[in-house]
């Protein structure tokens, strides 16, 4: 005769170990978020700590906890009660996440970091740099990689809108910022800290401080890839990124238009002055396929190849054209709705072309141990 399984506290904790805090990406059991476990016969009641009152992930955490507990063999009624951490508990959590670090540091500046960092740049605005950043990041996240985005375009921030996370502000735990996650991508932007569409009116030093905070004060976890969406041109932010994250590689975005390509070269030649590597060139808004199958080159053709060839000569290195992204209305449409085209319409021409570029970016970088971390601006 079969005996009924008696649920134990160990069973409950093992189940809860499958529940992650969505903002931190670690099991709630490892984060000391399980407040209590009470078992009465076959009924199970658990208490779970949230990092802050009004936690935006409360429904997700509660639902996931309830789901794993209801899968327990022989379980009866399941109840989940939510509590809020005290200031002392939040400090302990922040200390645990920082590990041996006594204060904020930029993990991506560590010579042993394995995170591949891409600074996405363009000579001028309007070439689709931010759209490329968001879709490349989302494409890699869809393949199972851990990906983040820093919206370093402080004045022209657009990442929250393109990711559909305008209404998701970051959670702050003892001065450590937990970035929102959308489509599997952690991302941070100054747009998450301002009211509505208010402009940012800052001078250079404030820009530098913002980038430092995004890199050091945000909990990124163990990222495979970090994208930094730079502002157009070669100003303060581009230099700041080169100095704070010297192993960042430049991804140059241009259009086929000759004038845009010429300006894009300037964004690429900053690599000579900062000793950065150029990962490649992306040509956006390439030919548009018409209903009859013909291709209309609305913005001309050859701009991407021109930039790649010219930068190869100027930097004495092999700078490849990683891909040409066709002019596809779906790319714009899904950008407006915050649903990147690579996941919302994966079979569209633009999505396929972007994934082909993403496939060339997903390898973790080599360690910079023993190499100079002080790029000079010549």
Feature roles, as predicted:
Residues 2-35:
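N-proximal, solvent-exposed amphipathic alpha-helical segments enriched in charged/polar residues
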Residues 16, 34, 55, 69, ...:
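Residue-level signature of catalytic and energy-coupling elements of molecular machines
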Residues 22-49, 325:
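Short edge beta-strands and adjacent turn/loop segments
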Residues 30-33, 51, 58-121, 369:
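Extreme N-terminal, non-catalytic leader segments
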Residues 93, 209, 217-220, 224-333:
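Conserved catalytic-core segment of NTP-binding enzymes
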Residues 116-154, 268:
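Walker A/P-loop phosphate-binding motif and the immediately C-terminal alpha-helix
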Residues 140-204, 208-215:
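Phosphate-binding loop that captures ATP/GTP phosphates
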Residues 337-350:
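C-terminal boundary of histidine-terminating zinc-finger modules
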């Amino acid at each position: 005769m079969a005996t009924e399984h008696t649920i134990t506290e160990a069973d409950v904790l093992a189940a809860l170990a499958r529940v992650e805090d969505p903002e931190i990406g670690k099991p709630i059991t490892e984060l000391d978020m399980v407040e209590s476990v009470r078992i009465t016969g076959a009924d199970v009641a658990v208490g779970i700590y949230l990092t802050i009152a009004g936690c935006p992930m409360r429904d997700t955490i509660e639902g996931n906890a309830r789901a794993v507990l209801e899968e327990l063999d022989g379980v009866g009624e399941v109840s989940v009660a939510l509590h809020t951490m005290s200031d002392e508990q939040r400090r302990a959590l922040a200390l645990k996440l920082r590990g041996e670090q006594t204060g904020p540091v930029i993990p991506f500046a560590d010579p042993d970091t394995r995170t591949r960092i891409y600074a996405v740049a363009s000579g001028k605005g309007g070439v689709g740099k931010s759209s490329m950043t968001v879709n490349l990041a989302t494409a890699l996240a869809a393949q199972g990689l851990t990906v983040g985005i820093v919206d370093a375009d402080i004045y022209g921030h657009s990442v929250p809108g393109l990711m559909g996370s305008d209404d998701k502000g970051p959670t702050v735990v003892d001065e450590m910022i937990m970035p929102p996650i959308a489509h599997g991508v952690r991302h941070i932007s100054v747009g998450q800290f301002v009211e509505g569409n208010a402009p940012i009116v800052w001078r250079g030093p404030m820009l530098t401080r913002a980038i430092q905070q995004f890199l050091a004060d945000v909990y990124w976890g163990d990222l495979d890839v970090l994208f930094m969406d730079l502002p157009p041109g070669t100003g303060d932010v581009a230099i700041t990124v080169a100095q704070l994250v010297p192993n960042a590689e430049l991804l140059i975005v241009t259009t086929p238009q000759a004038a845009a390509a010429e300006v894009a070269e300037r964004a690429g030649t900053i690599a000579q002055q900062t000793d950065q590597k150029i990962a490649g060139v992306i040509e956006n808004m390439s030919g548009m396929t018409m209903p009859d199958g013909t291709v209309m080159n609305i913005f001309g053709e050859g701009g991407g190849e021109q930039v790649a060839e010219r930068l190869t000569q100027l930097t004495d290195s092999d700078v490849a054209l990683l891909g040409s992204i066709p002019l596809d209305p779906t790319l714009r449409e899904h950008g407006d709705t915050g649903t990147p085209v690579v996941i919302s319409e994966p079979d569209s021409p633009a999505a396929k072309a972007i994934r082909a570029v993403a496939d060339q970016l997903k390898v973790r970088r080599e360690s910079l141990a023993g190499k100079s971390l002080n790029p000079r601006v010549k």
